[in-house]
Curated annotation (Swiss-Prot):
BP term (GO), one: methylation
InterPro entries in the record: Ppm1/Ppm2/Tcmp (IPR007213), SAM-dependent_MTases_sf (IPR029063), SAM_mthyl_Trfase_ML2640-like (IPR011610)
Task performed by this protein: Exhibits S-adenosyl-L-methionine-dependent methyltransferase activity.
EC number(s) recorded for this UniProt protein: 2.1.1.-
Annotated protein name in UniProt: Putative S-adenosyl-L-methionine-dependent methyltransferase MAV_4764
Lineage of the organism: Bacteria, Bacillati, Actinomycetota, Actinomycetes, Mycobacteriales
Protein's UniProt keywords contain Ribonucleoprotein: no
Source organism superkingdom: Bacteria
Membrane-spanning intervals of the chain: none
One annotated GO molecular function: methyltransferase activity
Origin species: Mycobacterium avium (strain 104)
Residue numbers binding S-adenosyl-L-methionine: 121, 150-151
Keywords: Methyltransferase, S-adenosyl-L-methionine, Transferase
Length: 296
């Protein structure tokens, strides 16, 4: 039985994207494929093992519901990996990954000595990942601290209890989190809490949706049905919450940050994927924007 109920859909798809990108030489995540296998989505594990995602001529490889999403997730992973490397070179030794899912950055990346990575997610997600990695005899590359808590709860207090120091600059990562997963009020609260816990010089990397297309919900329904046919049961209501969201770079700029934004085309181009694959489907476009910001 698939374990998506334990780890979540976005975590599962993120692992699939990293597994594909690793086989293509775009990333180096040796744990993505075994983690995905442990989740147990036959369609994904079979397609990756057969290299079907990487082949343009294959029926699966041409499916925009698969390739466009996995390309975007892989591009974002590379974007965040590079962001963290730059933060380390700048002297930041405290990292917080919000909703870390099945990513394994504390194991797979190089870190400057003295770095602590705090991974926040629901306890069952962290427990699932830890169990699989123990079975793989995975070795940490830096200090790691798992913080099992829902981001709707008081996660800053949970961070402080395990040694997080808000007086020191932090590198924050918010992947697939500011794209409608939280309700508008919840997203604003998360950004307020993050800002309050950020000393001068802290940095943030995140993705968000700059606009909400009126056709977006229709496209998402089609997206969900496509993945259900492949064995991945997605609850659309738990994934996105349509509403009036702040434009994230603008919100950050008015709350003590200096933001910069990049397009999905920029990130895909950096991976050499170019225009041959397009994010979105049908008449609506699911086109995220990628934000970095520095606390002033």
């Amino acid at each position: 039985m698939a374990a998506t109920a334990e780890v979540g859909v976005t975590a599962t798809l993120g692992a699939a994207a990293r597994a594909v990108a690793t086989r293509q030489g775009l990333l180096n995540d040796p744990y993505a494929e075994p983690l995905l296998g442990a989740v147990g989505i036959d369609y994904l594990t079979r397609a990756i093992a057969d290299h079907t995602f990487a082949a343009d001529e294959s029926p699966v490889g041409d499916d925009p519901a698969v390739t466009s999403l996995l390309d975007a997730l892989a591009a974002h992973t590379r974007f965040v990996d590079e962001f963290l490397a730059e933060a380390g070179r700048a002297g930041i030794r405290q990292v917080v990954i919000l909703a870390s899912g099945l990513d394994t950055r504390p194991y797979r990346l190089w870190w400057p000595r003295g770095t602590t990575v705090y991974e926040i997610d629901r306890p069952r997600v962290l427990d699932f990942k830890a169990g699989v990695l123990r079975g793989l005899d995975a070795r940490l590359a830096t200090n790691r601290c798992a913080v099992g808590i829902d981001l709707r709860d008081d996660w800053p207090a949970a961070l402080r209890r395990v040694g997080f120091d808000a007086a020191q600059p932090t590198a924050w990562v918010a992947e697939q989190l500011l794209v409608g997963y939280l309700k508008p009020a919840e997203q604003n609260r998360l950004l307020r809490r993050l800002t309050a816990a950020s000393a001068a010089g802290s940095r943030l990397a995140a993705d968000h949706l700059p606009t909400w297309d009126p056709l977006q919900l229709e496209a998402e329904r089609a997206f969900v049905e496509g993945w259900r046919r492949r064995g991945l049961d997605i609850d659309l209501a738990s994934l996105t919450h349509p509403g009036e969201y702040h434009y994230v770079p603008e919100y950050l700029a008015t709350h003590g940050w200096e933001p910069a934004a990049r397009s999905i085309a920029d990130l895909l181009g950096a991976l050499g994927l170019g225009p041959r694959r397009r994010a979105g489907s049908g008449g609506a476009q699911f086109i995220p924007e990628y934000v970095t910001a520095t606390r002033v």
